[in-house]
């Protein structure tokens, strides 16, 4: 019903009502009835009414009064004020606006007069904005496009003003825009505004408004979003991504002048995509047995890609709160991977890694998972069920091995796993016999469970203890994790204290144990391990007077060799190594260490160093300490390739005898110089490959360095590590050279020596035989068809895995080979083709889970970058490089962004892509810990729901807590019917309960009994807000004292 308004006459009456209601703490249901009466007697415009309500809050002088948001909500529900007007006027009366507009009018002297500093309104502002968002989410938003447009413009004004606001109060120039996130209340408003915009765009009128914005409004909103989204990346990545998508889909940018007609016309198509997507209903999710089987295979296909937090986050995304299924299927999958490895005849080193994951990694991870769970996980039950599902032929009992024909490779694995579980307190030791079904043939380790701090203390007291621990790190007893933690922490401490002698000993021990490096990466990332080592090498101070130079070279070389062993074994990038400085010595060595320089390009110091080393190696009788003291280790390693180039050129030109050259290079077989052979052999291999003339001298030198006639015992282990590092590169160049010079007989002996070192590298690359088998598909289609066949076999096995406990043959190297040889986009097309086929045959649920897992599975090329993004580390100081290749997830994102044409051509395929993209993003979602403890993820999920319902049990408990308050309302004089009596009389009657006791005690109790505390401070306001929505948005109120028992006496 419309009223003729007279703001001038009605304003004082409404102001009096608000003053009385606030001072007497009138609950929202009573305020609603009073407002109905008041509007009939004293009609008023919405602009004047909302101004009066907001002005009334200043009378309390409190930062937070819960009644104000409730009163505003009541008036909005009654239709007396609209959502756009609430937001517009709220901004004008906000602390943010006051601080951003300090001058209000000219004074008598003509100068501006600053406003008086008022109590902060931010907590109230935030709650009102949240209520607006709740209203829109529950389908009670603007009914017309114009109203939605006004809300968008109001939000844009809020964002612009908020970002111009100075939290420090010293003016906008004193703070950076991102500083708003450091202010708790400001950060809450920042998040609420973004979520409000997302909520509005989720409605039909919101989409219509965005599609029909005027040029002025589009520019205003575009400017606001362009300023908001960069800061939002530090607040919530899902929110930022959603706003980015909105801005792109609706072409909302500050200026449209640079955009062509074709791009502008895409707006309608993008809206159609959004509408199409909103009609795509997700199918029920299923966790197939093949899912974790694929994922663990991917974790261990190359270098171990394990980050406990990320892995647990993936498992939580996959299983939700079903911890029992999570644990049971995780154990089962680990056994399946080991079983598959045996049937595929994987290498002994791969089988060792699979076994180490099951025995040494999984039990402590389960203990970590159990400790972080809010509810107790029945581990023994889970383990019992998991063991009942593993293939008995692959994991026979000890007694069964006697009746089997040699198939007892994994006979000890079950009891190794169980004893490791007992070691980590997952099960009692007494349960092992029952779980095995026979008497165990081993016991718990003699020393029991190792503790990191104890081991560190032992190493500090006796450095030789580190060597003893490393000798036992590869045993299958369950203590590897503690050993790794202790060794790495000791290394980091030695780096910080620059105790390089002890550090050298540990690095040498690790360098000669390639399998130990695999074990270490089950527990620690390469960047965590190596960053302190790289920093130490980068910052190594060289003093010519520091003492024995050979000892310094020895220590430096040992540390460097371990870094190089990690780098070449796992094909690590500078980001993987933890290098973030462009002038890093390690970075320069990796980039240019194997490349020689022309003499004219050397600096004077480099020329001096080069001459000194040539003299020491080929002229003098040996390398003296004096000849080394003038050249730092860093300078020497960067000169090695040039030293070889100049020396070999001199020999080939007849300026140096071959025996002199050979004898000089043999000095590099001394332990303190041996690591330099990595650069020397790499350069020499490239030189041989590039040479078209005489190769005699180069090949003789290479053979002498690869297979020296004599070498000391200490140097043998280092030499073996050097050949492990350089063998792959040398093999490729020598095979190509042999193909060009088939008559030469001096190349094959070198290749024969290098062959034993090929298994050193672990990168997930496939061998040529395996690759050819995947390409040679009888049906055609090559690698992609082979991947589809593998996909199909995984779906078939997951349909009923109990029929065949033996898992289908699978290696994630096949996926990696497909991505590397034909590209992620073609592999993805094959997966979607097979997904479509499986969906049509009734296996859609399982196929979606398997396809999503294949896409989510980690890759070495992107893993470190994903780790950094997962932890949201500071990326401003050192910008992150892009991923080395397009991942399957990236390719799916591109498919998702280009659906407009596919929707018309193949809507079924478009639906598959949308569902698959949702499933992948759900599995890969990162938990956001936003400022103010705002659970943005839950709120975002709620916004996309058609209806938000509360938890029935919580609602029941809430109702059980309210009966006393509801009953006590009967004793309060409240209006009845639609035509209550005299307003003043009713106000006086309502206030009588408050003022009955002159001391205020009874008044406070009466107020509480009347439901003022319960309803006025976060209870049921009686204005149509459901409990479910209150639950959803309650986490946004951590900055507000709604959850504190307010002192009502002080408020009266």
UniProtKB/Swiss-Prot annotation:
Biased composition (Low complexity): 959-970
A matching Pfam family: Med5
Compartment(s) of residence: Nucleus
Family matches, as InterPro entries: Mediator_Med5_fun
GO molecular function, one term: transcription coregulator activity
Broad class of where this protein is predominantly found: nucleus
GO biological process, one term: regulation of transcription by RNA polymerase II
Keyword annotations: Activator, Nucleus, Transcription, Transcription regulation
Spans annotated as Disordered: 949-982
Keyword hit for Nucleus: yes
Record-level GO cellular component terms: mediator complex
Family: Belongs to the Mediator complex subunit 5 family.
Subunit structure: Component of the Mediator complex.
Biological role stated in the UniProt entry: Component of the Mediator complex, a coactivator involved in the regulated transcription of nearly all RNA polymerase II-dependent genes. Mediator functions as a bridge to convey information from gene-specific regulatory proteins to the basal RNA polymerase II transcription machinery. Mediator is recruited to promoters by direct interactions with regulatory proteins and serves as a scaffold for the assembly of a functional preinitiation complex with RNA polymerase II and the general transcription factors.
Protein name: Mediator of RNA polymerase II transcription subunit 5
Source organism of this protein record: Coccidioides immitis (strain RS) (Valley fever fungus)
Gene that encodes the chain: NUT1
């Amino acid at each position: 019903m419309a009223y003729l308004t007279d703001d001038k006459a009605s304003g004082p009456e409404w102001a009096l009502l608000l003053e009385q209601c606030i001072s007497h703490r009138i609950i929202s249901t009573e305020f609603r009835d009073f407002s109905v009466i008041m509007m009939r007697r004293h009609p008023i415009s919405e602009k004047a009414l909302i101004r009066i309500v907001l002005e009334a809050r200043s009378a309390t002088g409190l930062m937070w009064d819960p009644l104000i948001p409730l009163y505003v909500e009541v008036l909005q529900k009654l239709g007396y004020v609209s959502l756009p007007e609430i937001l517009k006027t709220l901004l004008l009366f906000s602390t943010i606006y006051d601080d951003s507009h300090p001058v209000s009018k000219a004074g008598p002297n003509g100068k501006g007069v600053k406003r008086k500093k008022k109590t902060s309104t931010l907590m109230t502002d935030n709650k009102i904005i949240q209520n607006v968002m709740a209203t829109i989410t529950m389908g009670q938003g603007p009914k017309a496009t114009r109203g939605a447009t006004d809300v968008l413009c109001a939000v844009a004004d809020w964002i612009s003003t908020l970002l111009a606001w100075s939290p420090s109060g010293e003016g906008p120039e004193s703070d950076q825009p991102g500083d708003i996130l450091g202010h708790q209340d400001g950060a809450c408003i920042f998040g609420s505004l973004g979520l409000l915009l997302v909520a509005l765009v989720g409605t039909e009128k919101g989409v219509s408004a965005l599609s029909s914005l005027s040029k002025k409004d589009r520019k205003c909103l575009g400017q606001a979003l362009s300023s908001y989204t960069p800061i939002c990346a530090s607040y919530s990545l899902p929110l930022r991504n959603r706003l980015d998508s909105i801005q792109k889909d609706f072409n909302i940018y500050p200026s449209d002048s640079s955009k062509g007609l074709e791009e502008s016309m895409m707006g309608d198509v993008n809206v159609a995509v959004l509408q199409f997507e909103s009609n795509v209903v997700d199918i029920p999710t299923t966790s197939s047995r093949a899912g974790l089987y694929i994922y663990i295979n991917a974790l261990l296909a190359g270098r171990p890609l394990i980050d406990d937090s990320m892995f647990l986050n993936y498992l939580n995304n996959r299983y939700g709160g079903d911890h029992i299924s999570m644990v049971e299927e995780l154990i089962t999958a680990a056994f399946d991977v080991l079983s598959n490895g045996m049937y595929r005849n994987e290498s002994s080193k791969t089988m060792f890694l699979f076994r180490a994951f099951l025995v040494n990694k999984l039990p402590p991870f389960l203990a970590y998972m159990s400790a972080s769970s809010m509810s107790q996980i029945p581990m023994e039950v889970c383990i019992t069920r998991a063991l009942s599902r593993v293939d008995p032929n692959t994991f026979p009992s000890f007694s069964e091995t006697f009746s089997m024909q040699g198939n007892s490779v994994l006979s000890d694995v079950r009891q190794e796993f169980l004893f490791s579980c007992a070691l980590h307190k997952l099960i009692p030791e007494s349960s092992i016999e029952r779980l095995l079904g026979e008497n165990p043939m081993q016991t718990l380790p003699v020393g029991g469970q190792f503790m990191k701090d104890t081991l560190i203390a032992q190493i500090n007291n006796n450095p030789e203890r580190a060597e003893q621990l490393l000798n036992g790190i590869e045993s299958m007893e369950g203590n590897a994790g503690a050993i790794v933690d202790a060794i790495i922490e000791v290394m980091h401490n030695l780096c910080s204290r620059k105790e390089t002698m002890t550090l050298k000993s540990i690095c040498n021990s690790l360098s000669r144990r390639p399998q130990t490096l695999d074990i270490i990466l089950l527990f620690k990332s390469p960047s965590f391990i190596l960053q302190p080592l790289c920093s130490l090498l980068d910052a190594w101070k060289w003093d010519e007077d520091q003492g024995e130079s050979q000892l310094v070279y020895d220590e430096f070389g040992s540390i460097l060799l371990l870094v190089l062993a990690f780098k070449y074994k796992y094909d690590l990038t500078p980001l993987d190594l933890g290098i973030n400085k462009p002038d890093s010595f390690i970075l320069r060595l990796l980039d240019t260490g194997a490349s020689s320089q022309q003499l004219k390009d050397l600096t004077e110091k480099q020329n001096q160093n080069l001459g000194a080393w040539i003299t020491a190696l080929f002229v003098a009788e040996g390398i003296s300490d004096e000849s080394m003291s003038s050249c730092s280790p860093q300078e020497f390693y960067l000169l090695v390739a040039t030293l070889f180039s100049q020396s070999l050129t001199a020999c080939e030109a007849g300026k140096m005898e071959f025996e002199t050259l050979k004898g000089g290079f043999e000095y590099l077989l001394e332990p303190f110089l041996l690591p330099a052979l990595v650069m020397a052999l790499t350069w020499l291999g490239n030189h041989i490959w590039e040479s078209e003339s005489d190769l005699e001298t180069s090949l003789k030198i290479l053979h002498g360095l690869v297979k020296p006639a004599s070498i000391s015992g200490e140097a043998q282990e280092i030499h073996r590590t050097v050949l492990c590092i350089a063998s792959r590169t040398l093999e490729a160049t020598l095979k190509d050279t042999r193909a060009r010079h088939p008559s030469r007989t001096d190349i094959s002996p070198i290749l024969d020596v290098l062959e034993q070192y090929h298994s050193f590298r672990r990168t997930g690359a496939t061998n040529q035989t395996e690759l050819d088998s995947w390409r040679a598909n009888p049906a055609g289609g090559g690698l992609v068809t082979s991947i589809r066949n593998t996909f199909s076999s995984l779906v078939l096995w997951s349909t009923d895995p109990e029929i065949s406990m033996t898992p289908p043959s699978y290696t994630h190297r096949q996926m990696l080979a497909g991505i590397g040889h034909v590209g992620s986009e073609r592999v993805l097309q094959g997966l979607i083709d097979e997904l479509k086929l499986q969906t049509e045959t009734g296996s859609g649920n399982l196929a979606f889970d398997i396809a999503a897992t294949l896409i989510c599975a980690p890759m070495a090329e992107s893993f470190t970058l994903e780790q950094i993004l997962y932890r949201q580390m500071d990326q401003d100081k050192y910008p992150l490089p892009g991923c080395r290749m397009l991942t399957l997830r990236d390719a799916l994102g591109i498919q998702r962004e280009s659906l407009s044409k596919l929707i018309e051509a193949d809507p079924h395929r478009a639906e598959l892509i949308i569902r698959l993209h949702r499933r992948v993003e759900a599995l890969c979602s990162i938990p956001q810990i936003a400022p103010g403890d705002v659970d943005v993820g839950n709120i975002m999920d709620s916004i996309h729901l058609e209806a938000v319902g509360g938890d029935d049990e919580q609602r029941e408990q809430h109702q059980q807590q309210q009966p006393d308050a509801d009953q006590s309302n009967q004793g309060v004089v409240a209006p009845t019917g639609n035509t209550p009596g005299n307003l003043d009389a009713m106000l006086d009657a309502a206030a009588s309960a408050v003022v009955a006791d002159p001391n205020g005690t009874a008044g406070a109790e009466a107020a509480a009994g009347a439901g003022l505390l319960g309803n006025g401070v976060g209870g049921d306001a009686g204005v149509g807000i459901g409990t479910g929505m209150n639950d959803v948005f309650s986490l946004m109120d951590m900055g507000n004292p709604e959850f504190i028992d307010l002192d009502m006496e002080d408020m009266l």
